[in-house]
């Protein structure tokens, strides 16, 4: 049995998680698959991926409410789909969550409005 990028229905996932997983899968299919093995310049490619994740609305899954939509299941389904297509994309997504956590949990309102 080979792995599949399609999210499977799960008793632990709500419809919103399945929809988010499908968005992440579609992102991987159309933005990552063709270039997944072209990671000769990881710094440049990482910036490109993060920009695409932001434009695609997926970075919100790495940011806590009210500025984002993060909950554990959302975080997991996005990372699962990104990792299927590109470990660099998964790492870039995870790093955005690590970087934004300090601002979302302890930043001033001005910092949150600027960075999140």
Regions of interest found by a model, annotated:
Residues 32-116:
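Glycine-rich flavin
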Residues 1-19:
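Intrinsic disorder at enzyme termini
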């Amino acid at each position: 049995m080979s792995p599949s990028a399609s999210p499977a229905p799960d008793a632990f996932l709500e419809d919103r998680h399945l929809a988010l997983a499908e968005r992440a899968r579609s992102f991987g299919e159309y933005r990552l698959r063709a270039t997944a093995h072209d990671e000769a310049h990881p710094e440049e490619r990482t910036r490109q991926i993060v920009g695409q994740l932001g434009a695609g609305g997926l970075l919100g899954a790495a940011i806590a409410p009210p500025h984002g939509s993060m909950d554990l299941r959302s975080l997991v389904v996005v990372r699962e789909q990104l990792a299927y297509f590109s470990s660099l994309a998964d790492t870039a997504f995870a790093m955005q969550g690590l970087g934004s956590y300090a601002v979302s949990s302890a930043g001033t309102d001005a910092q949150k409005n600027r960075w999140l």
